[in-house]
Amino acid sequence: MAEIRNYTLNFGPQHPAAHGVLRLVLELDGEVVQRADPHIGLLHRGTEKLAESKTFIQSLPYMDRLDYVSMMCNEHAYCLAIEKMMGIEVPERAQYIRVMFAEITRILNHLLWIGAHALDIGAMTMFLYAFREREDLMDCYEAVSGARMHAAYFRPGGVYRDLPDSMPQYTVSKIKNAKELARLNEGRKGSMLDFIEDFTKRFPTYVDEYETLLTDNRIWKQRTVGIGVVTPERALNLGMTGPMLRGSGIAWDLRKTQPYDVYDKMDFDVPVGVGGDCYDRYLVRVEEMRQSNRIIQQCVAWLRANPGPVITDNHKVAPPSREGMKSNMEDLIHHFKLFTEGMHVPEGEAYAAVEHPKGEFGIYLVSDGANKPYRLKIRAPGYAHLAALDEMATGHMIADVVAIIGTQDIVFGEIDR
């Protein structure tokens, strides 16, 4: 009888479930995975090196392009690192706006995750549902920064501008009749805070719809329960963070354990799993969407009652107002210096981490006192999770690899960076 041997299969980088440019070399015994070898680097753009030749403000838009699904959370960590080194005091209103948009970003990320994860496993409807809600939140991004994805809205010392008084409205087109237009524009008649408040009232019903589709669906359970189990000890040893760690039963959330901005004033719960499998991580992320909604509601209520500055008045860090520049020579000089030479960050080093939708996203910044970083190190949460893929997939069927990649919520912008 011929010798039985394993065969090797390339999964990706063109595979639709590979979430970008993942190349997995799978060693199979029949349909059972014996070893999974992830190959990374296909989306490497040298972000850390590029930052060394750019001023601190010029590097900010690179952050959006790391995890291009959780744009403002990346910016948040970068701004916190600079603020830590320079000892900048951020106005309270700016902190509330940041927290609100960080949670909007978390919902955006989890919506794409639940849509794509369900689509990979075979539940197509979920994908369409998720994109319906993402559209509203993308409009918030666009209203506040002018861009739907790469916003570059956060700034060292605050945010780029205050929240607008109006929302963009849909106009007449061939595919939308008057009745449809009236429905779409119903919540857009007031300010941006009105629109966000309207969304937060509608959103829990939408999450209930997702749970109706998936939570007790027996096919969904068959594809996720007991798949990719990670024990609490292994989750810690493998460097997992975020929903991957909380899904294994460890209540570690930087927003609670090491609060930044105004998270210490927020009332929310940290969902924790029990079994550490794909199903538990799904439940954790769904509950996170509900908790993010709660935080956004608290931010909206505070922002309504407390007007004020949204960026520091230190013009060595933040540009002066347009009006000031037109009438005051000193403001004009500050503006010119800031956007040509940039700000000089004191010599030293700092690490700032945020509770990113995927885990702990950290920025380690080293400065030699110049106007550019001496070294910028990015701690991407997905990097540690992908390293655990071999351990999570071994012994499972090849079809379950897709579910495990989905549950890790991998985006290659941050892994290859």
UniProtKB/Swiss-Prot annotation:
<keyword id="KW-0472">Membrane</keyword>
<dbReference type="Pfam" id="PF00346">
    <property type="entry name" value="Complex1_49kDa"/>
</dbReference>
<dbReference type="InterPro" id="IPR014029">
    <property type="entry name" value="NADH_UbQ_OxRdtase_49kDa_CS"/>
</dbReference>
<dbReference type="GO" id="GO:0005886">
    <property type="term" value="C:plasma membrane"/>
</dbReference>
<comment type="similarity">
    <text>Belongs to the complex I 49 kDa subunit family.</text>
</comment>
<keyword id="KW-0997">Cell inner membrane</keyword>
<dbReference type="InterPro" id="IPR001135">
    <property type="entry name" value="NADH_Q_OxRdtase_suD"/>
</dbReference>
<comment type="subunit">
    <text>NDH-1 is composed of 14 different subunits. Subunits NuoB, C, D, E, F, and G constitute the peripheral sector of the complex.</text>
</comment>
<keyword id="KW-0813">Transport</keyword>
<dbReference type="GO" id="GO:0050136">
    <property type="term" value="F:NADH:ubiquinone reductase (non-electrogenic) activity"/>
</dbReference>
<dbReference type="GO" id="GO:0048038">
    <property type="term" value="F:quinone binding"/>
</dbReference>
<keyword id="KW-0520">NAD</keyword>
<keyword id="KW-1278">Translocase</keyword>
<keyword id="KW-0830">Ubiquinone</keyword>
<dbReference type="InterPro" id="IPR029014">
    <property type="entry name" value="NiFe-Hase_large"/>
</dbReference>
<keyword id="KW-1003">Cell membrane</keyword>
<protein>
    <recommendedName>
        <fullName>NADH-quinone oxidoreductase subunit D</fullName>
        <ecNumber>7.1.1.-</ecNumber>
    </recommendedName>
</protein>
<dbReference type="InterPro" id="IPR022885">
    <property type="entry name" value="NDH1_su_D/H"/>
</dbReference>
<keyword id="KW-0874">Quinone</keyword>
<comment type="function">
    <text>NDH-1 shuttles electrons from NADH, via FMN and iron-sulfur (Fe-S) centers, to quinones in the respiratory chain. The immediate electron acceptor for the enzyme in this species is believed to be ubiquinone. Couples the redox reaction to proton translocation (for every two electrons transferred, four hydrogen ions are translocated across the cytoplasmic membrane), and thus conserves the redox energy in a proton gradient.</text>
</comment>
<dbReference type="GO" id="GO:0051287">
    <property type="term" value="F:NAD binding"/>
</dbReference>
